[in-house]
Amino acid sequence: MKKENNSAHNHNRGSFSGRIGYVLAVAGSAVGLGNIWRFPYLAAKYGGGIFLLIYILLTASFGYVLIMSETALGRMTRKSPVGAFEHFGKTKSFKIGGWLNAVIPMLIVPYYSTIGGWVIKYLVEYFKGNVQAVAEDGYFGNFISDSWQAELWFLVFAALVFIIILGGVQNGVERMSKIMMPVLVVLAVVVTIYSVTRPGAVEGVKYFLIPNVKNFSWMTVVAAIGQMFYSLSIAMGILYTYGSYVRKDMDIERSTTQVEVFDTGIAILAGLMIIPAVFSFSGGNPETLQAGPSLMFITLPKVFASMGFGTATGIVFFILVLLAALTSAVSLMETSVSTFMDELHWSRKKCCGLMVVIMIVLGTASSMGYGLLDFIRIFGMNFLDFFDFMTNSVMMPLAALATCILILRVVGIDGMVKEIEQSSPFRRKKLYRVFIKYFAPICLIIILLSSIANVLGIISM
C-alpha cells in the first residue's frame, strides 16, 4: 500500500522539461556566492594559478563522481534525500543520512539570504551613485551592525526567493534559470573584459592563471577541496532533489560534464573579474590579496571608487552577484520545500510557508548577529559564522560520506552504473569505480578533520 501511495506522489512531482532546463538549474545552484565571492578570495590567498589547477583537477574527478552519484540516486528513487535513503534503508535509522543532506540547505539558505541582502543593499547604493561612500573605511561594518537595516535587506532578498519557489519547478525554478544564467554569463564577460584591461591588471592575470609551484602548500589542496565541495552544491540535497525531477532518458554523465564546465568557467571568470582589478588597484600588495571574505564588500568598492566608470562597474558587478546568489538560494529553498512535500505530504504552498518561517527565524538571527545579537556567541562565533562552519565544514562532509556508504554498502557500485547506463553508455566507468570506493571517502575525511583542526587552532587555514 505504501508503494502505491509513493507512486502516486512521485507521479505528481514536478519535472524539468528537458536536459537544458536541468543543466541550467543545477548550474544555477552551483554558480552562486561560492564562485563569485568565495572562489576569488581563496584563489588570491592560496597561490593563484596553483590553486586553480588543483581545483580543476579535483572538480573533474572527485566532484564529477559525487555529482553523478547524487543525481542518479535522485532519479533512481524519484525522491528527495530523506526518501532516497529510506528507499534503500533496511531500518529507520537509515533516514539519518537523508535528513543530514536535507537539513543542510535549511540551515544554509537563511544566512545565505542575509549575504544576499547585503548584495542588494550595495546594488541600491551604486544605483544612487554613492560609489565613494561605500568605499569608505567602516562603511560595511557600520551597515551590518545596524540590525534593522540588515534585517530589511535580508527580508527583501528572502521575498524574491519565495516568489520564485512558489512558481514550482518548470514555471519557477527552470524559467528563472533559463533567463538568469545567460544574463549572468554576459555580465561576467563584460566585467572581466573591463577588469583585465585596467593598467597593471596583466600581473594579476598571470598570478591567477599561471601555476607557480613556490605558492603550493598542503592547505592549498585542503582549500581547493573545500571550495569544490561548496561550489558544486555537493551534499546539500540539491542534486538528489533535481535528479528526482529528470527523465530516465537524460544522459547523466553528459549533463554532469556540462554543469562542471559551466561552473568552473564562471569561477574562472570571477577570478579574472576580481584578482586583476585588485592587482591594478594595489600593485599586487600581498596584504590586499589576503583580504579574504571581505574582498567583495570592502576591497572591491575601493577598487571601483578608483575607476573612471566606478558607478557603472559597481552596478553591473552587483547585479551579477545578485543573480548568482538568487539562483543558488532558490536551489537551496527548493530542496527544503521538496523534502517537506515528500515527508509531510503537504501542498507546495504550505511547505513554502513552513520554510519561510524557518528562513525568517534563522535569517533574522544571522542578520542581527553583528548588531543586537552580537553578544550571543557559539564557540566564539556569531550566528552567521556558526551556521557557515557547521554546514560547510562538518555537516556537508558527513552527508557526502553517508552517500558514499549508501552506495558502497547498500545500492552497490554495479547498481549505480546500471542506473547511469539507462540513458547512455557510461564512458568513465572505471574512474567512477575507483573514486567512489577509495578517493572520495578519503578526501571527505580530510576536509572534515582539517576543518575541525582549524577551529581548534591546530592548523591555520
Predicted regions and their residues:
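Select transmembrane alpha-helical segments in multipass membrane proteins
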Residues: S15-V26, I50-I54, K92-M106, L152-F157, ...
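Membrane-interface "cap" regions at the ends of multi-pass membrane proteins
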Residues: M1-W37, L66-T71, R75-F88, K92-W99, ...
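Extracellular loop-to-transmembrane helix junctions
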Residues: A43-S69, Q149, M395-A399
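Transmembrane helix-boundary motif of multi-pass solute transporters/channels
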Residues: G18-L58, G243, R254-T257, V261-T264, ...
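Inter-helical loop and helix-membrane interface segments of multi-pass membrane transporters/permeases
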Residues: N10-R13, Y41-Y46, P81-L100, S113-G172, ...
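Membrane-embedded translocation segments of transport machinery
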Residues: K2, A8-N12, F16, E174, ...
